């Protein structure tokens, strides 16, 4: 419509708390040559976890009431969550490559600021390792208020990426806009049990339908990994509208079923490279029909 004025107001709120700069663990002053450890066939002995909270209270800049309270509230990542992501264990031959890859695996977590794995003691062919990690603040509120073209939109939610130090992510969100109202719940874990399987579940209850999804994926988690596999299932039912001059002019109901599965193969690390093959199958079915008790003319696309 010509001459129509549109006013947009947006408000966003987020609380993000980060730790201070990473400092080397106290034991880092003991330096051991990784190549020498490997050449001498060093065996991994004790694996010590050195876990730091979000804020370093030994730093005067971070030692205040607010940061002390944040550290008190925050649950530091549990030992078992760290250990199950290591590519080695006590009794294995020491490998600098596996230590470096384990650091990479740990750093991929949203709830960790950094990770360092350092040999700290070597005697009689046995090397002890220090695994130093530092947590990030993991609870993030979500709040967004906006107004566009006379219509209000509201989003409110909570996103916890490290529930009680378990490494599990939980997200709850309530979203209301001109198209639909949604209540969304998501839960995911990158390492289910003691496995390398990453699983996620999403449930959304909408004013015009629903949206459900589940996935389980075992990735190539290291350079020498020999296989990967995964499945994804998605079911979605919603009302869609067609607009003319900013107003709803027609509508239809869409039902979608999406399923996929894949399998990957590899001979593992060969020299300095790894070659991988992946094959999969996808089923994607979209069906369209009239909206039950609809108030607008139906404009129904062809199924595909």
Give the label of every model feature segment:
Residues 2-13, 22-304:
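Immediate N-terminus of the mature polypeptide
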Residues 17-18:
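Short, linear, compositionally biased motifs with a strong N-terminal bias
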């Amino acid at each position: 419509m010509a001459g129509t004025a549109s006013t947009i107001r947006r408000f966003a709120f987020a609380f993000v708390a980060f730790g201070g700069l990473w400092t080397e663990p106290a034991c880092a002053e003991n330096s051991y040559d990784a190549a020498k450890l490997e050449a001498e066939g060093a065996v991994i002995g004790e694996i010590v976890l050195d876990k730091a909270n979000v804020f370093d209270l030994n730093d005067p800049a971070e030692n205040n009431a607010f940061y002390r309270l944040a550290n008190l509230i925050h649950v530091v990542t549990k030992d078992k969550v760290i250990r199950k992501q290591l590519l080695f264990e006590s009794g294995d031959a020491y490998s600098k490559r596996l230590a470096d890859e384990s650091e990479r695996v740990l750093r991929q977590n949203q709830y960790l600021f950094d990770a360092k794995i350092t040999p700290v003691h070597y005697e009689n062919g046995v090397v002890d390792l220090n695994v130093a990690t530092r947590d990030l603040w993991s609870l993030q509120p979500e709040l967004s208020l906006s107004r566009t073209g006379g219509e209000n939109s509201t989003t409110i939610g909570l996103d916890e990426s490290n529930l009680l130090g378990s490494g599990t992510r939980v997200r709850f969100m309530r979203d209301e806009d001109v198209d639909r109202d949604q209540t969304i719940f998501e839960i995911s874990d990158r390492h289910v049990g003691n496995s390398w399987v990453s699983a996620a579940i999403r449930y959304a209850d909408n004013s015009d339908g629903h949206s459900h999804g589940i996935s389980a994926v075992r990735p190539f988690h290291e350079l020498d990994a020999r296989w990967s596999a995964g499945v994804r299932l998605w079911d979605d039912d919603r009302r869609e509208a067609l607009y003319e001059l900013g107003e709803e002019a027609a509508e239809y109901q869409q039902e979608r079923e999406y399923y996929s599965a894949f399998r990957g193969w590899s001979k593992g690390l060969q020299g300095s490279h790894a070659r991988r093959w992946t094959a999969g199958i996808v089923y994607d079915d979209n069906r369209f029909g009239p909206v039950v008790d609809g108030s607008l003319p139906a404009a129904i696309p062809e199924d595909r």
